[in-house]
């Protein structure tokens, strides 16, 4: 990459291809396009310098260009080493927006790119974060913690990725002037977080009194978690497995670990493809839901020798262990649709015999001769082996992200360093923006009907405690 180019992409020559797909995606993302039209004139994000860490896909390109249209300056990385769509990254780079994303990054490259989010091209710093999984947010928090003198954690990494991340922090402490991380933390006015795992990290920081800036939990907007997490996974999971393996799904036995929104969508995806689906759960409520949906609810220990396909969707660690994989059928397919790669004990497989079949598809042989097929090295299968969720469902998620960025940027000082959610009025607005595209005719309450149930005829239609 020439030094005067403020981007890193696989091939800038893919920009035209990416631009064509972005144009198609825009027609499938009515919420984002409506927000772009509504706010472009007022430029509510003027002055915002957004450091974005979110899968660099075609759909994300539409989000980026919406933020740009509303006045923001932007730098972007992908939040997963396998999720970048290279033609999307090329199109964004060609449009003059700094992006550092390549499908198949090394972990070292991933964290180096993340660091470049915070070195603004004019020598300044970002003042907003748009995050997915929390890595950009963790970069700021870990750096400031070490800068303040608490460095012991940097010498005790718990994984290969932490080893690389902590080495980066050590290097930056040497390279940057003293107080650089403190200045960065002070500069950030807020973060909007996309996914369950990242939100979990934020709530822990807030509970411990360590959150450095206000955060909006986009994940728990109804129009995100009940649509992206559920309906998105329902379409994209099987797409990833099929592209990775070309296996016949019908008739296979599949095991889904976790029956939250992502697990529900995953189980439905497999069932719709003709699989006989089992589910494991720790939560009795979710376990009962799965059973009432007709799934066999059992343990991973019971399912390991029986299933042909395994999917983790828990947000927890070590859900599929080495012992589970030892007892699986020959060439059982193992994959993950949770944000991080530690749901499957991939690190424990490193000393076994690996055969790469094709990008993001590996066959791993155990000493007894039986093999498993591991997709995307235990990272997000729907983005590593396929193209992620469809544009329409991502429009709802990214409309929430845009509204969250506007809320935080235009109301500086309003929020404490806690985690907030968007109001139900905005949730309903996001849903309403997507109805016309799919031909929905919404019923309007008469004044007497609205009064009867104690709501405004224009909404909100449900109390905050309502569970959709």
Swiss-Prot record:
It is found in: Cytoplasm. Pfam families: AdoHcyase, AdoHcyase_NAD. Its EC number is 3.13.2.1. It catalyses: S-adenosyl-L-homocysteine + H2O = L-homocysteine + adenosine. Keywords: Cytoplasm, Hydrolase, NAD, One-carbon metabolism. Substrate binds at residues 57, 132, 194, 224, 228. It is an enzyme of class 3 (hydrolase). Binds 1 NAD(+) per subunit. The keyword Hydrolase applies. Its main location: cytoplasm. SUPFAM superfamilies: Formate/glycerate dehydrogenase catalytic domain-like (SSF52283), NAD(P)-binding Rossmann-fold domains (SSF51735). NAD(+) binds at residues 195-197, 229, 258-263, 281, 316, 337-339, 382. It comes from the Bacteria. InterPro entries: Adenosylhomocyst_ase-like_sf, Adenosylhomocysteinase-like, Ado_hCys_hydrolase_NAD-bd, NAD(P)-bd_dom_sf, S-Ado-L-homoCys_hydrolase_CS. Coiled coil: none annotated. May play a key role in the regulation of the intracellular concentration of adenosylhomocysteine. HAMAP family: AdoHcyase (MF_00563). This is Adenosylhomocysteinase. It comes from Methylobacterium sp. (strain 4-46). The lineage of its organism: Bacteria, Pseudomonadati, Pseudomonadota, Alphaproteobacteria, Hyphomicrobiales.
